[in-house]
From Swiss-Prot:
InterPro entries: Prp18, PRP4-like, PRP4-like_sf, PRPF18
Gene assigned in the entry: PRPF18
Gene3D superfamilies, per database record: Functional domain of the splicing factor Prp18, Pre-mRNA processing factor 4 domain
Source organism of the structure: Homo sapiens
Modified residues (N-acetylmethionine): M1
Protein's UniProt name: Pre-mRNA-splicing factor 18
């Protein structure tokens, strides 16, 4: 019995020496006792205990959200509230959550931009974007200043210099549709860029107060929007991968425009954009025989304006250039479309 009491006393003394029990604590972990014994053993052997690397270095996480949350208190608010609202709306996010301050909304925007840097910009108001760009150019001019007597060309539109005349293009137009697709695509590209240049020169020749008016800004934005709409068409023409049915229709349109047959060009445009056969409604494939409506589904008869957004845009841009061509290179009223409206 005395041996048991002495052993209990020794264990109790060992726990007290190791300082394992703190105030108001009646138990300790076995791992803490083992760690204390290990330290005592190394001290008796003369080894110097070095802290582990995990204790020296802070715990890092591969999660960018956690890292951002740890450091977000140090970040100043570098964007205005209006810019934060605009960027959040672009990404379809609420501009303010319940109980959120302006700084919290800014931090939330930063997290969204880090996690999803790419934003879907497919469907948006292109005309408004062009107007905003023109307004920004005018604002930059006001901030930057201008020397007296200096010509104001900062806000002029880009002019495509094709180094050609309408007479040369009309001569080239006689060879359109003769079977040489590559030559036809080159003529189409040259003529459309020529019309864009004519349009830009007309807008650049306006007085400065006209350029700064609401209607003047709208006209400039329309020209820029048309140029951006036609870029996919120019790319397809350059790479020679324009679909055959689209190429055939555009060739007819350009040929009639060069002949100043604007009514025929408009008819060819409507044939391409709208088509002359509606898409059949209802079931067209029942059994082993196709129904009568199925025969009308053909690429030549279907509206290309409904195919995709890119085609719709450059078809719309082509129609605007048809109007510009009729305005600058007029002909008999019987061959024009809406002659009195121009």
């Amino acid at each position: 019995m005395d041996i048991l009491k002495s052993e209990i006393l020794r264990k109790r003394q060992l726990v007290e020496d190791r300082n394992l029990l703190v105030e108001n604590k009646k138990y300790f972990k076995r791992s803490e006792l083992a760690k204390k014994e290990e330290e005592a053993y190394f001290e008796r052997c003369g080894y110097k205990i070095q802290p582990k690397e995990e204790d020296q270095k802070p715990l890092t996480s591969s999660n960018p959200v956690l890292e951002l949350e740890l450091a977000e208190e140090k970040l100043p608010m570098t964007l205005s509230r209006q810019e934060v609202i605009r960027r959040l709306r672009e990404r379809g996010e609420p501009i303010r959550l319940f109980g959120e301050t302006d700084y919290d909304a800014f931090q939330r925007l930063r997290k969204i931009e880090i996690l999803t840097p790419e934003v879907n910009k497919g469907l948006r108001n292109d005309l408004k974007a062009a107007l905003d760009k023109i307004d920004q150019q005018y604002l930059n001019e006001i901030v930057g200043g201008q020397e007296p007597g200096e010509e104001d060309t900062q806000n002029d539109l880009k002019v495509h210099e094709e180094n050609t005349t309408i007479e040369e293009l009309e001569a080239l137009g006689e060879s359109l549709g003769k079977g040489d697709d590559h030559k036809d695509m080159d003529i189409i590209t040259k003529f459309l860029k020529f019309l864009l240049g004519v349009w830009a020169k007309e807008l650049n020749a306006r007085e400065d107060y006209v350029k700064r008016s609401v209607q003047g800004k709208l006209n400039s934005a329309t020209q820029k929007q048309t140029e951006s709409y036609l870029r996919p068409l120019f790319r397809k023409l350059r790479k020679r991968n324009l679909p055959a049915d689209i190429k055939e229709s555009i060739t007819d349109i350009i040929k009639f425009m060069l002949q100043r047959e604007y009514v025929k060009a408009n008819d060819a445009y409507l044939q391409m954009a709208i088509g002359n056969a509606p898409w059949p409604i209802g079931v067209t494939m029942v059994g082993i025989h196709a129904r009568t409506g199925r025969e009308k589904i053909f690429s030549k008869h279907v509206a290309h304006v409904l195919n995709d957004e890119t085609q719709r845009k450059y078809i719309q841009g082509l129609k605007r250039l048809m109007t510009i061509c009729q305005k600058h290179f007029p002909t008999d009223p019987s061959k024009c479309v809406e002659y009195n409206a121009l």
